[in-house]
Amino acid sequence: MALMLVLFFLAAVLPPSLLQDNSQENSLEKLSTSKKSVQEEIVSKHNQLRRKVSPSGSDLLNMEWNYDAQVNAQQRADKCTFSHSPIELRTTNLKCGENLFMSSYLVPWSSVIQGWYNESKGLIFGVGPKQNVSVVGHHTQVVWKSNLQVACGVAECPENPLRYFYVCRYCPVLNYSGHYPSRPYLAYTARAPCASCPDRCEDGLCTKSCQYKDMSFWCKRLEYVCKHPGLKKRCLATCQC
């Protein structure tokens, strides 16, 4: 149970030797997630790693940027509070998961994300950590099959020895049963890439599926449903996907 308490919302402080590459070439402004190029780097790195999971996965989604989650991820980073935020502060139109990272020096986003992914070395897929002390929650968050969107923020916290604080949000939040994931070490289905989505596959990842659900069977039958505010609330999939 102690292991489960720390599994999915973990904060990382990775060794300098792992992440020192090119750190001197970065400035806080260059890492700002308000920049389109930085957003693209973060999304691209996540999708690159999701394509290379081992064993291969049949149902991992191709991730996109979430602008609303970017705002609250940056707000959390700016607070310089090295702890996970409550779920209500990680909610936009979706509830979102969270990875944290702190460093005494600036680290490229791609290296931060790679560091999270590299926790796979301590994980036996479908079973759990190789040792009780192995941290694998960041990796699981990065490769969780139903991650549809990602957004991040970074801030400088001068009063903290680990003065650079990175926050990433993953939407929707992991599939929970009570307080913990029902199958925490099965982040995806181990089959050939896109085997679960042959009609909507892009370079080994499943393309966007609808994040909403219709509440009534008649939603797709009524032409005017999306023009009526009350009906639209019951037909979110029809009206927004």
From Swiss-Prot:
Pfam families: CAP, Crisp. GO terms for cellular component: extracellular region; transport vesicle. Residues 210-241 form the ShKT domain. SUPFAM superfamilies: Crisp domain-like (SSF57546), PR-1-like (SSF55797). It is found in: Cytoplasmic vesicle, Secretory vesicle. The keyword Iron-sulfur does not apply. Gene3D superfamilies: CAP, Crisp domain. Its main location: cytoplasm. InterPro entries: Allrgn_V5/Tpx1_CS (IPR018244), CAP_dom (IPR014044), CAP_sf (IPR035940), Crisp-like_dom (IPR042076), CRISP-related (IPR001283), Cysteine_rich_secretory (IPR013871), ShKT_dom (IPR003582). Residues 1-19 form the signal peptide. Residues 44-170 form the SCP domain. Keywords: Cytoplasmic vesicle, Disulfide bond, Glycoprotein, Signal. The keyword Signal applies. Expressed in submandibular gland. Disulfide bonds join C194-C201, C197-C206, C210-C241, C219-C235, C226-C239. Induction: By androgens. Glycans are attached at N118, N132, N175. This protein is supposed to help spermatozoa undergo functional maturation while they move from the testis to the ductus deferens. Interacts with A1BG. Interacts with KNG1 isoform LMW. Belongs to the CRISP family. This is Cysteine-rich secretory protein 3.
